[in-house]
Amino acid sequence: MILRRLLLAGSLLLATSFTSAKKADGPKISATKFKDEPVNLFYFDDSDTVMFQDGKNGDVYVSRDAGANWDIVDGGTHWVTEDQAKSWREFTVDAELSRYEYPLVFHGKDSNRVMLLGHKCKGLDCKERTYYTTDGFKTVHLLMENGRHCAWAVSTPTFGEGLDLPKEVNDRIFCVVSGLHSSWAEANRLLYSDRFFKDEQGTEVPLDNGRAVSGVIRTASVQKYILAATKSARTNELALFVTDDASTWHRTEFDGHRVEEDAYTILESTSYSLQVDVVSTYSSTIGTLFTSNSNGTYFTRNIKHTNRNLYGFVDFEKISSIQGIILVNTVKNWEDVEKSNGVQKKVISKISFDDGRTFQPLKVGKHDLHLHSVTDATNSGRVFSSPAPGLVMGVGNTGGHLKDYLDGDLFVSDDAGINWRKALDDAHKYEFGDQGSVIVAVFDEGRTDKISYSLDHGKNWHKASLPDGVQIRAKVLTTAPGSTTLKFLLLGSAKADIGMEYYIISIDFAEMEERTCEEKDFENWPARLNEKNEPDCLMGHKQFYRRRKAQADCFIKKKFEEPAPEFERCKCTEEDFECDFNFVRGEDGKSCIPSRSLIAPEGVCKNPDDKFIGSSGFRLIPGNVCIREGGVDLDKQTERVCSETFKNPPAGQIVVEKSFFTADYYKDYFYLERKESSKGEDETVIMITSEQHIFLSRDHGKKWKRILEEEKITRIEPHRFFDDVAYFLTNNGDGWYTLDRGDTFRKFKAPLPPNQDKLPVLSFHPDRRDWLIWTGADECNGNGGNCHSVAYYTTNLGGEWHFLMRYVRRCEFISRDARGSSDKLVFCEQFENENPSNKHLQLLSTEDWFAEKRLHYSNILDFATMQEFIIVAIRGENPQDSLRIGVSIDGKTFADAELPANVQIPIQRAYTVLESRTHAAFLLVTINNMEDHEYGSILKSNSNGTSYVLSLSAVNRNSRGYADFEKMQGLEGVAMANVVGNVADVENGAAKKFRTMITHNDGAEWTLVRPPDKDSEGRSYACSTKGGKPTDACALHLHSYTERADPRDTYSSPSAVGIMIGTGNVGDYLSLKSKADTFITRDAGITWEEVKKGKYQWEFGDSGSIIVLVTESTPTKTLLYSLDEGRSWKDFEFSEVEMQIQDISTVPSDTSRNFLLWGKEVGQGKKPGLATVNIDFSGLKERSKHIPFNLMDASSVTEPNITANGPTRIAITAENYSTWTPLGISANAHDRIMNGNKTDLLICSDYNYEPQSDGSCARVAGLEPLDPKLVCTENPKAIEWYEPTGYRRIPLTKCQGGKQLNHIVAHPCPNKEEEFFKKHPRLRGIGLFFVILIPICLAATSGYYVYNHWDGKFGRIRLGETGSGGLFDRDSLLVSIPVSMVAGVVAVITALPLLVSSLWRSVSGYVRVPGGASSRRPYSSRDSFAARRNDYTGVVEDEDELLGTDDFDDDEEGDERNGQMKNNGHVNEAITIVFLF
């Protein structure tokens, strides 16, 4: 305590005060010096109490006299004050404050209700924690863990005004939490609870028409509105949802404008509308201002090209206390800025007096005035205005556009911005006091020792000096909230002997000899004037203020009493109405038209031409108080036509649109798919034809238009990670791109032409849409041999390119989310010493654009990046050496992959990295690389990609390295592969024969595919299965990846969960494709059935509720479609002329009801050229019935053993998707994951172990397992290691409980014995003593009691008598039953060792058991038994009781008994009986 007082005294010595004032002539000014910079300065409302924090050491200072004197506040953990810092109360929480968000979230109407956001860490493992209090931190309770963001429903004082909200809304809390089974942002959910999440997980908020939506990234509260932003994967576009009652939500509509992540700003709004500024498509520093209707649903454009900065701040401010006046800055040369990021913006200022409907320039006489605003604000608080009625100030200049801040002067208006005049030369900070009676300004272009002030609305100015000649650089000039006091605070910095020192200067006008204002000194001032200079109406009233006249020589002196407006009602006009629900503004901006089909009264509309009385489309803005009598009445109900109640009425028919092109064929096509959070209804397709013409369709091929006609586009590059984006490239380095699915296009210029190494020209960033790497060709114009590739990067869509590296082969951005690395992590392949002739390709990485670089490998073949792994193929030192594999998870540390010894790999020349999304990497290691004879083995890694085991041998691959391997979309762990079934013959030069294999546990076990029982015509197949299981002679085989013309034509769909379609045959091998039939499965490949004879192309639609088939390679004019998962099929004629169909397509998610056929007419009456046919199933009537979605479980199938370990559980992994239900019924379901028994998902796949034919797991002969103790060195937190068993947990499994075959015998890690025995406590010491002693004591006590009360004591002989019938008679049940039980237990314990040894001998004769007797042959005949009877072990003497021999036999019977004991056959029989028992 003494030390603390000394420190306090020392700090107060530093705070030396100076005073300089003349009581009558100017303000009283005092200065307090501080060693370190004050930060976080704020006032308590309606008081002179001010606080700030020392910017260096965090000490808190408080002043109770508006900054004249300061005291330090005693420290502690967390403190709260309820009396303006007069007293403090300490509180604690078991967490550190949040680093990413403001830690305190306040209730809008109850100051005692607060949430605290924090986190608690154990080592590197941190969990977000949210706490709450309802009594001002007297008690603190944990709300939830891992809540990403929480907020009160009632977050503002105005929320719920005018609504009769339920009481529970006052307790309601919204929290953004991670997905059920995914931590990705697109899986986030919004939950709410009215009980602080007690005894509940919370309820998902029904954001979209009563349906929960995934991907919630943030919520925000503004005035009476709550907004929630959601984002889907693979797009930057957001969906915003809004509510004004915390219960009913609506999706916002921005008049066709896109809203993107980090590209919108919610501005200061009113109680009757929201203001949102949305970034323009091509510039992050130019926006468009939107204003909503009263419920925040429909937004209309107010003004385009608003000025904003990269931090999201917008030059927008509402004039304080006056409704409807808005000051904005816009960009005059917006076209030039959007064309090039290097163009300097020309900013101009505008003002609106009608709530943003119209804008006009600011005027100083006849000159336009432009003011610096929010984007370069130099003071705290509001930029232009305060509660002082009508007074507005700003720094700027007159002329054509805004100049630099240092070139500006101070301007003032006292009529709310209608007229302006110059107040002071040069830029100044400024503040208002005493309701505008006093204005203070301080020079803001350098150091100053004076302040300026005005007492007449800025017309005349006076100066006052700072005390003792102090010269400061002004940082903050402020006053109490409300601008009603005569006291101001000025914070500034000054030069010290060493470094800087800081001053807080108190400026007090209270002691100036100014009288108190009287009634004659005030005027009734209209807040808004119309074009006729008359008081204007807004929201049904005119607004007036009683304010001091500019020339009055008095002070108002009403401390903490803000001026109150007076209102005068007006008659209703058109401006008092807005569009009603389900209506939007028409193109004229005046009418309101239906946004969707109207709802007519029941029984009214029988014909489309009938009429009914309904909404006019308008309604009075809620809160508007205009006088209806004698005014406009736009919301009067009107007569409507019944045809408006049907928008796109179901026709019950399939609609066809055919289009023709002059080209012979298409080179490629791409879908730019609209995601759930994206606006609009487009289904965009882009095609490049054989003539290099580019066509675009926004309606899935119904109508096409040619785009970029003047450009010589040679290739189209869709963005790998964002489905809205595509690039159109030429051979000279010019290019175009679209960010909005072809709605608009913008040109860019690359630094070099595309490379000539047949490598990807563009590399895309997984998370940053605008970041690109361009690999171009340099020095390639002449015939010289120095042509090489050079990489450049851009972070603004090609607006500016920066050199990255030369002599590269390929560069890639590396995803940050899975690795926790920098988003600037880039990997490049570069030729060593920038010399391609040496053939040494280095793998380098950087996190700062190669200002510094890291060398990982000096001689690689290639590298591949996946969601979780970076895999590198490394060359050996000599050409004949095999390739090695390097693996990294974090992009920094690589480890060599350990390949299994039981895979015989020759000199390794090729690896194929297969799809790896289930926490394990799949590699195809080529075994035979001879042309047309290629095959290899699939290896599967552990969770860090370093240890591999054999998954499947002899997998087919082609000469390009692609393998017949495909994972099922939508389900974890299901995959199919084609293997070479005649390996021995292939090694001798024979052609390959294929068989299809399937796995349901992510490659741990593979089986042949079970064939259907009968074909599509009801006939049995020529071969037969064995007990329903496939055999080598009879299984289903399907054509796979290497035979596809388009690799996008996969077996399965991400939304048609569980369904796969393929072409193939039933038999011993896969036959020719020309002889294939078409098959379908609905249970993820467990059972199959033949759909049709012949080979068909297929496509899924409407999340699997529609399946379309069209013949492959055969001219046709009909297709087949099914609405019940392929159980029944219907024909549909799509063309009058037969067509050769090359492909059938739909959107990649398979959620559309539109399909597109690609081909050409070949029949009679054909038209030349390429043709596309759109098939639209949208007209089919939907059923209103809902069928629940069922979790598929392989155990529900009649087959007894799907895999060696029993029935397989299949888990749906999509977090939220529209899924199919039979008969064309669309439903929406969240995923469900069944956590299986752990034994089912532990497979014999540990390093150097392999499964045996009997199902056991054994180590490969001569090989050793990985050192199990490595877990202790690799993970410092590990406390134990386990002896290897050969079993390994499948990386994707979510199983819980059950047998842990991989964790049987545990040992402590070095120096972790204490933690180990805490986890695995042993019985020892006093505990062991009592465990032994207590049973003995109980037994002795019981025995003593029974001995003294039992009538059958030792020594008594009773011949032929029964017991006495007493309680403890020996025949009493109370005695006989316990005696029997004890005797049985003793007999079992005695016999157990003998029984086990006997069983071991029996079992070891039939089952191979490693070690022991496993090597002995079972006896198959009497002779074989007799030949080895000496090896048989006799039963020891003590076994007689076990086998039932009577102890009471006399000695003469002993020999006979002993002789019987030597009869090994009888003994074996007896033992067998006991074993069965």
UniProtKB/Swiss-Prot annotation:
Q: Which residues are glycosylated?
A: N295, N944, N1201, N1216, N1237
Q: Which residue ranges are recorded for the region named Disordered?
A: 1443-1463
- Keyword Transmembrane helix belongs to the record: yes
Q: Tell me how this protein sits in the membrane.
A: Multi-pass membrane protein
Give GO BP annotations, semicolon-separated: Golgi to endosome transport; Golgi to vacuole transport; protein targeting to vacuole
Where, in residue numbers, are the BNR repeats?
Answer: 61-71, 351-360, 411-421, 453-463, 695-705, 1079-1089, 1121-1130
Please note every region of biased composition (Acidic residues). Answer: 1443-1455
Q: Which Pfam families match?
A: Sortilin-Vps10 (PF15902), Sortilin_C (PF15901)
**Lumenal topological intervals:** 22-1325, 1394-1477
What are the UniProt keywords, alphabetically? Answer: Glycoprotein, Golgi apparatus, Membrane, Protein transport, Receptor, Repeat, Signal, Transmembrane, Transmembrane helix, Transport
The signal peptide annotation in the UniProt record is: 1-21
GO terms for CC?
A: cytosol; Golgi apparatus; membrane
Give the UniProt subcellular location, in the record's own words: Golgi apparatus, trans-Golgi network membrane; Prevacuolar compartment membrane
Outline which residue ranges sit on the Cytoplasmic face.
Answer: 1347-1372
TM segment ranges: 1326-1346, 1373-1393
The reply on keyword Ribosomal protein is: no
Summarizing the function annotation, the protein's role is: Functions as a sorting receptor in the Golgi compartment required for the intracellular sorting and delivery of soluble vacuolar proteins, like carboxypeptidase Y (CPY) and proteinase A. Executes multiple rounds of sorting by cycling between the late Golgi and a prevacuolar endosome-like compartment.
**Which family does the record claim for this protein?**
Belongs to the VPS10 family.
Q: What is this protein called?
A: Vacuolar protein sorting/targeting protein 10
The uppermost taxa in this organism's lineage are: Eukaryota, Fungi, Dikarya, Ascomycota, Pezizomycotina
Q: What would be the name of the gene that encodes this protein?
A: VPS10
